[in-house]
A protein has these predicted regions:
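Nucleotide-sugar donor-binding/catalytic module of glycosyltransferases
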Residues: 1-222
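C-terminal subregions of glycosyltransferases and related glycan-biosynthesis enzymes
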Residues: 183, 189, 211-306
Length: 306
């Protein structure tokens, strides 16, 4: 079985379309676990409508916990996911019919090679669309998900995987643990664990339509444009990003170091110790260790604010 975890908040406008796309998957052995974080629109009403229609497929979590963020909402919802495999779903996308089946097929191939006890994460590709599900032309090289540098040292400072594309096995789901403020995003946290202790694999296939609208948390942006690059360097978040990466890395070490492969334990320890050095030493060790982002402009900002 596959548990599909959906974290909702004021998503009524697109929710029915997304739920229908999941229920119409070719892979049928699923359960949709939905946790709402205090919506004031018709989101909960829609969920209850679908739960009544598909009682064996839809679970609505009612725990009276106010999370206040997408990452916390997802991780709170994941506590109820007990199936052998777990996926995450946004409330406003559209899954193509074979998304689950093709993800499961690849997962089983990997588990047959390395075993089910290792954390495994597989993820596909999305097609950006507008709010009416009409295609948006975004050159592949300009997408935020373009590079897929699935190297542990790179992943410590930049995530390349959207949660809505992921399938994780039970070993990975169990290793994620409870929410902590040091976790930057639930998908990034999952990728770090899988990369350090097991494996992460990209499936080069469009599996879903990623709806672009004003309320998206993350989008398919042109990371090569001058405007985007300049904004990233000047953005106040960039100044604070390095310490956030270190805090997340420290949490990974505290919680999961015994799971990590020996070489990744060493890489993680070296990364954490960077902050004990002066700026020039940190810059040198970032470069030597390969703890770098995906392109020149991002790296400049990273080194400038380290």
């Amino acid at each position: 079985m596959v548990d599909i975890v959906m974290a909702t908040f004021n998503g009524g406008k697109y929710l029915r379309v997304q739920l229908d796309s999941i229920l119409n998957q070719t892979y049928k052995n699923i359960r949709i676990i939905i946790r709402d974080d205090g919506s004031i629109d018709d989101t909960v009403e829609i969920i209850r409508e679908y739960r009544e229609k598909y009682p064996e497929k839809i679970v609505l979590i009612s725990d009276n916990v106010q999370c206040g963020s997408s990452k916390s909402n997802f991780m709170q919802a994941m506590k109820s996911a007990t199936a052998e495999y777990v996926m995450c779903s946004d409330q406003d996308d559209y899954w193509l019919p074979d998304k689950i089946q093709h993800s499961i097929d690849r997962m089983l191939e990997i588990e047959q090679k390395i075993g089910k006890d290792k954390p495994v994460l597989v993820f596909g590709t999305y097609q950006p669309v507008d709010e009416n599900l009409k295609g948006i032309k975004v050159q592949k090289k300009n997408r935020q998900e373009s590079a897929y540098k699935l190297v542990f040292t790179n992943l410590l400072v930049q995530n390349y995987v959207n949660g809505c594309l992921m399938l994780m096995n039970r070993s990975l789901a169990d290793a994620m643990g409870d929410y902590n403020d040091a976790i930057l995003m639930h998908d990034w946290w999952a990728v770090l664990i899988a990369s350090g202790a097991g494996t992460v694999e990209h499936i080069d296939e469009v599996m879903m339509l990623y709806r672009q609208h004003c309320n998206n948390v993350v989008g398919a942006v042109n990371v090569k444009s001058f405007r985007y690059r300049l904004k990233k360097i000047l953005d106040s978040d960039t100044k604070n990003a390095n310490i956030l990466y270190f805090n997340q890395a420290k949490l990974l070490y505290e919680r999961n170091r015994d799971l990590l492969m020996p070489e990744h334990q060493i890489e993680l320890e070296r990364f954490i110790k960077l902050y004990d050095k002066k700026k020039i030493g940190r810059m040198i060790d970032l470069i030597r260790g390969g703890y770098l982002k995906s392109d020149f402009v991002r790296i400049v900002g990273q080194l400038y604010y380290i």
